[in-house]
């Protein structure tokens, strides 16, 4: 392939393998080398999403037809007119960065948005994302349930779990609980189990050559076999926590059938309560070009016993062979994207709760243990005094608040009612009463929304203001574009000067307030501080976007 951007591509082991996975392989090679376009997912939970989409259109962005707005409850996918990470306009680069940092959009590869679309989440669902970091799919799951329900986003690696927390807060969602466990040994959740489960499994990533060109040199035919057992163990564990009637997606960004169809086949063999079902991809991602799952592929597994099934070879069972075409394969060349694999399962078991939650005996199920003492610094329900302070000081009622350190977090009701308060089974069959996180190691639940100081309520956080703004009844003041422009350019005015512009500030106590501005059919909620001066309390991303809305040119 002369002139190739990655000169080793046509000589790679991956190219050799792809030629054995599909007959018309040449178009794939041509499409698997150029850089991906920059793609974004718009957060549909934000009231200013129309403003965000106008700005993307002004930058030359276009909606991706098969990731249209409103389909399957997820935000629209957008394609920008530059290669991934190579925007040449500093102004456009700064705007997209600010939109991402403030949670209005999420940088995400287009095909990576497919699994959540096909999972079919609904408001109120209890969802598990077993391998959740860095969090693009986990936040997409929160969007898919309209932030009503619970998404348990699990990650085994501590550093990646912290990244997951950061992305949760960036997206501004209240329905996510971040946990840290080896996914193969995830504890039992309360009955009846999860309504939806996503297993976006660790994989070789050989479908990501357009963003990870080192794959061309790094990938080997043995790579998929080395991950097969881990992928299968994760999928099995997830299946055991899926309630009857619930649905589970297994997905990878790999093209290797050893990581995909071979895992699906082994899962169907070992979990007789699972059925592979039609993903309705043409309905949920209209216009996306896909291929069915493979039923034949080369394999060189070693079988030493006559009755042993080679887990790497194509299945011989007629029912599994008939089911595999229901899997979804996305190839790089057919959608100008990366590649992806998705399989959708349904729990068709006739039991009442998830398989892992079925008690070993009636006696064991009746055994109640006292809940363990909570870990230090864990989030707990806010004290009545804090809830009352939020109601009397700011006029906000009817929100679920948890407390840790100097922060109050807003949580979805389902986190408290099911994941915190629900009884849960122990490994030996006993039951624990609710009112704690145990046995889960919870890193963060909900959205930090209120700052406190020395136990006293201070102000709404900038991360939570988009949620709290419409609820606030006190300490909210209408402002003008003129005053906000001056504050962004020159800094905060003396409080006497601010009162001349905003008469309602007369008599306002010192401390945190919120300024409200109607601009371009959008409402801006701006945290500020009343002292000797009126000072904006905005992070850089919000300052930048407010400046854009006001027509200002601010330093990036």
Predicted segments, located by residue:
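S-adenosyl-L-methionine
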Residues: 154-191
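Short beta-strand element of Class I
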Residues: 148-152
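Mobile active-site "lid"/loop adjacent to the S-adenosyl-L-methionine
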Residues: 159, 192-237, 242-245, 249, ...
């Amino acid at each position: 392939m002369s002139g190739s951007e990655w000169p080793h591509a046509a000589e790679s082991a991956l190219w050799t393998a792809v030629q054995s996975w599909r007959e018309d392989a040449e178009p794939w090679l041509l499409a698997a080398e150029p850089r991906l376009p920059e793609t974004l997912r718009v957060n549909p939970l934000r009231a200013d999403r129309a403003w965000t989409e106008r700005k993307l259109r002004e930058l030359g962005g276009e909606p991706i037809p098969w990731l249209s707005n409103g389909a399957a409850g997820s935000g629209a996918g957008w394609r920008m007119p530059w290669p991934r990470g190579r925007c040449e306009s500093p102004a456009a680069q700064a705007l997209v960065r600010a939109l991402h940092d403030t949670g209005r959009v999420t940088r995400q590869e287009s095909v990576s948005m497919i699994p959540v679309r096909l999972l079919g989440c609904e408001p109120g669902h209890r969802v598990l994302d077993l391998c959740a970091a860095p969090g693009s799919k986990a936040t997409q799951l929160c969007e898919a349930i309209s932030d009503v329900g619970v998404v348990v986003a699990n990650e085994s690696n501590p550093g990646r779990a912290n990244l997951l927390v950061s992305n949760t807060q960036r997206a501004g969602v209240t329905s996510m609980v971040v946990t840290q466990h080896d996914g193969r040994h995830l504890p039992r959740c309360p009955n009846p189990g999860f309504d939806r489960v996503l297993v976006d499994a660790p994989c070789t990533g050989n479908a990501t050559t357009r963003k990870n060109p080192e794959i061309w040199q790094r990938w080997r035919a043995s790579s998929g076999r080395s991950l097969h057992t881990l992928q299968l163990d994760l999928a099995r564990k997830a299946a055991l926590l899926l309630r009857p009637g619930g649905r589970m997606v297994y997905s990878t960004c790999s093209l290797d059938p050893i990581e995909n169809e071979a895992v699906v086949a082994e899962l169907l063999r070992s979990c007789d309560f699972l059925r592979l079902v039609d993903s309705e991809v043409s309905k949920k991602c209209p216009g996306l070009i896909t291929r069915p799952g493979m039923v034949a592929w080369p394999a060189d597994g070693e079988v030493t016993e006559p009755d042993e099934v080679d887990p790497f070879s194509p299945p011989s069972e007629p029912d599994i062979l008939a089911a595999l075409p229901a899997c979804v394969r996305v190839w790089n060349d057919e959608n100008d994207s990366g590649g992806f694999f998705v399989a959708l399962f349904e729990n068709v078991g006739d039991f009442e709760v998830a398989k892992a939650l079925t008690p070993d005996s009636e006696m064991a199920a009746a055994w109640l243990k006292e809940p363990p003492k909570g870990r230090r610094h864990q989030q707990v329900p806010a004290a009545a005094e804090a809830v009352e302070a939020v109601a009397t000081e700011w006029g906000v009622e009817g929100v679920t608040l948890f407390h840790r350190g100097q922060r109050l977090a807003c949580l979805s009701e389902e986190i408290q009612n099911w994941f915190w308060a629900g009884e849960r089974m122990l490994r030996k069959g006993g039951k624990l009463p609710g009112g704690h996180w145990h046995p889960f190691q919870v890193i963060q639940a909900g959205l930090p929304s209120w700052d406190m100081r020395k136990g006293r309520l201070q102000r709404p956080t900038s991360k939570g203001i988009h949620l709290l703004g419409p609820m606030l009844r006190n300490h909210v003041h209408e402002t003008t574009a003129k005053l906000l422009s001056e504050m962004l350019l020159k800094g905060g005015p003396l409080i006497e000067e601010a009162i001349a512009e905003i008469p309602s500030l007369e008599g306002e106590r010192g401390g945190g307030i919120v300024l409200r501005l109607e601009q371009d059919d959008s409402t801006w909620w701006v945290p500020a501080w009343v002292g000797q001066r009126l000072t904006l309390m905005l992070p850089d991303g919000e300052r930048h976007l407010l400046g854009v809305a006001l027509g200002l040119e601010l330093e990036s």
